[in-house]
């Protein structure tokens, strides 16, 4: 069939761009015949494909991005990394990598989604040879959706247990406690014999009720990955409740998601402010904040500091997951995504920095109360959320109130990240379905199947060996290594294959002006260099996963982790090689064909220079001489 090329590629109408009663094109490129007038009805009485949704108001998009990108990592990981890597000095590599890596890629993904009006896979119709990036992001976000919700389930469990007069993790004597359990004490108490005449050396071997509640009651931790054990029925119910909540947040699309995030994205800030006010009034809070910010300039010479800064930026900005492109795809075509990206990046990093004051004011109080150095109580990740902070609130007046506030904030921080991640996955999935496969309740059923599948996989994490499985997912599947790999190839595809100047023109077409040239320079040079540099450092300084500094994973457990990582990382080269091998012609012809963009219907007004093409609408019949052939794939 004859093909008519536009200025920068060939046109393709994606399913969600067909308005009203329109249906997919027939095999000859013309609209397929239907039962309605002029053949425009759906064939055989099939349902019409609805137009792609857009945000009710632009603030819905802003709040959704805040809810997704600002998550648990901002509260429980950044403050610890800042303390561990030289205090205020850590802000130097953090800000530098944000400027040359985080913000440019953050903007790239949002603008790409807005321009292509597609989810994480079809967005790469801009450079079809690199569609493997879309499949890779779908794999990564699926892994994230699977294991991330476990933190919500644990947080929900702690929240329920907080509604008691005495917190269950504050005292010994419960069925899950061992004879080695000793309640919270000051370090000097052991020296003067006020704790049952035990010496400090003897007490060092005893266990806190907070740790025993976490390991023996919540996790019911087994001896290793090879001993899966039974399900924890209480945590399983909490997990099920979380998945039901996520389902009803996502099932109706961005119209419902955009409303829910107004609460889930803003209320955690209210709780953070309340906790900060409470924290700074506690004894020892100032010491904790000083430890958080105290500069250690020698740390700048350590490669690990730069690795930690880079991985934290890419993880907290939610880069490489495909969800940002999905959220951007629901924007109006002329939305100022450049301004939005800058604002969102500042909110993200600002939240991380602010959360450090909240966390370390509490940890400073905790260290003072126990008479130990703050390094003994500083934790990161689940250790902060479920050991350090629960221990701290037991020392406060009205402990259940502060525990309930903290875990409610934790639940909300994770909830919007979770359901927006699921939204990104579902968007990419539904964009793949041809228009002819559309059916009523397609979204609702797809979301239900996704949630059900993830729930079944999550059952492996509520067993006695569940924490070992959780750590495998966390350490390998969505690690800094996989996200840096994604970001590197995104820069290559857009800046070097499609063309950085060309994409800057596309952005100008949307927002009315070209962004700062810094973005183009970053996409072309600085960002890929930073990504590849930190990626290589990650590989060179790789350390096998160890749980709680004691349990070493078996070789097959580590192999499983690397399988998680490689299942996404190999999508890019395998798809690229597969396309080149299947295509026909010389290598130059294959490359030219496979890197030619496939435009959507909404690009006609902006991309086509031919008057016939510019005036084309799907409702207006055209002559054979001026017909534009619509193709669905470049393969």
From Swiss-Prot:
Keyword ATP-binding: no
Compartments it resides in: Cell membrane; Apical cell membrane
Catalytic activity: creatine(out) + chloride(out) + 2 Na(+)(out) = creatine(in) + chloride(in) + 2 Na(+)(in)
GO molecular function, one term: gamma-aminobutyric acid:sodium:chloride symporter activity
Extracellular compartment segments: 82-87, 160-230, 291-304, 363-394, 466-479, 542-560
GO cellular component, one term: apical plasma membrane
Feature: compositional bias, Low complexity: 25-35
Transmembrane segments: 61-81, 88-108, 139-159, 231-251, 270-290, 305-325, 342-362, 395-415, 445-465, 480-500, 521-541, 561-581
Record-linked InterPro entries: Na/ntran_symport (IPR000175), Na/ntran_symport_creatine (IPR002984), SNS_sf (IPR037272)
Membrane topology: Multi-pass membrane protein
SUPFAM superfamilies: SNF-like (SSF161070)
Keyword terms, alphabetized: Cell membrane, Glycoprotein, Ion transport, Membrane, Phosphoprotein, Sodium, Sodium transport, Symport, Transmembrane, Transmembrane helix, Transport
PTM text: Glycosylated.
Glycosylation sites recorded in the entry for this protein: 192, 197, 548
Chief location: membrane
Region (Disordered): 1-35
Tissues where this protein is expressed: Prominent in kidney, heart, and muscle, also present in brain, but not in liver and intestine.
Function: Creatine:sodium symporter which mediates the uptake of creatine. Plays an important role in supplying creatine to the brain via the blood-brain barrier.
Protein family (similarity comment): Belongs to the sodium:neurotransmitter symporter (SNF) (TC 2.A.22) family. SLC6A8 subfamily.
Protein name: Sodium- and chloride-dependent creatine transporter 1
Native source species: Oryctolagus cuniculus
